[in-house]
Amino acid sequence: MSFRFQIEATDGLARAGRFFTPHGEVETPVFMPVGTVGTVKGVPQDTLEELGVQILLNNTYHLYLRPGVETVRELGGVQKFMAWDRPILTDSGGFQVFSLSDLRKVTEEGVSFRSHLDGSLHFFSPESAIAAEIGLGADIIMAFDECTEYPAERARAQASMEMTLRWAKRSKEYFEAHKEEVPWFREVRDSPFALRSSPDERLGEQSASVGKQKQVPRGLTSARDDNPDLMAHDGTAEAVPFQSNSEHPGSGEERMANGEQREGQTQAIFGIVQGGTYLDLRRESAERTVELDFPGYAIGGLSVGEPREMTYEMVNAAIPHLPVEKPRYLMGVGTPEEIVQYVARGVDMMDCVLPTRAARHGLLFTSEGRVTIKNARYAKDEGPLDPRCNCKVCQRYSRAYLRHLYSSNELLAQVLNTIHNLAYYLDTMRRVRQAIKAGEFATFLSGVRPPHLSVL
């Protein structure tokens, strides 16, 4: 078995559980920081580990262009390349390709596009996109899909949905035929899988500590990250050696000793639900994608400019038609308040550039509301950014100092701001998981303040 998902508690539609991958287990609901080109901007991997990041998202389009799939494959896969031994998810590059607009041409076979780096011509088909994802070697990969713009006429949204369904079938067929080509396949298959201690156990330990102080894959043919707009609500890799970070009974070491089945011998591919902003198309897309029997399902094509309430409606339309026993991934969302709302609707996985992008523009998320750190009111503020936050930024630095760094265009401002925003998102999800397991999620949800009431 390559991928397994289990639900451990429910509260309403919200679920708490975990899934198992070749590079470790992930507790859900989970927020995945975006490391587009193999890095979360400004934050080294050891800091991400200290923050309790369980899984990262990398972008196939960007890594395909630079440094190239062949390079990453020869260096052992994306985990080994970026010195990160925890799980990674790659998107297929579809969203980035389709956002190029004037630089692309779509046919049934695939998409021709020009690189945003040098204008060179490239081609992605479902087969070549999956070949790239296999070559990169992430734990979870996405089927190749077509994203529609907003707004889109119904005929356009329906045609795109049909295309995505055909491409999903081709993506899965190619993956099934080539899944053993993942760079680390044989090492993981032949080695004990690292069943680590609970991510939340690791995070608790880390928080306490912080508080105290070879070939281009077949089918792949080759012929700017970071829009400052904040409107988003938006190969052989080393097998991970067995280690337990907890002496807690039932830890990974004990489960392995008891003979629990090893997981994660190759990648898992998720299908993507499309359908624009049409409820019936979203339902149809969900039902027909499920017929293809993926191990997990994503809801894509949202947070592209539509009103927030419309996003909620589209999620509500799709979720009931996705299998209860498989993870649900909502792509490209959202604010801290929104991700909690999506959990309430039954979503298990989310990613968004917002915490890192907003940090670089001086917008910080706190338990007291959003802080625009450049504001003059913070010039002599000796208090911490967030009195309730245990991240190393809030434990050490004042608002006045953070404002000084940002106003001086110091690189450290971006680093510290990003660390805090990620800590806030990750802590939010940790508290969500705890609330679901305690049967107190409704109470937790009622205490989440609306975004428009939380600006300082």
Predicted regions and their residues:
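Active-site pocket-lining/capping segments in soluble small-molecule metabolic enzymes
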Residues: 84, 89, 95-101, 107-118, ...
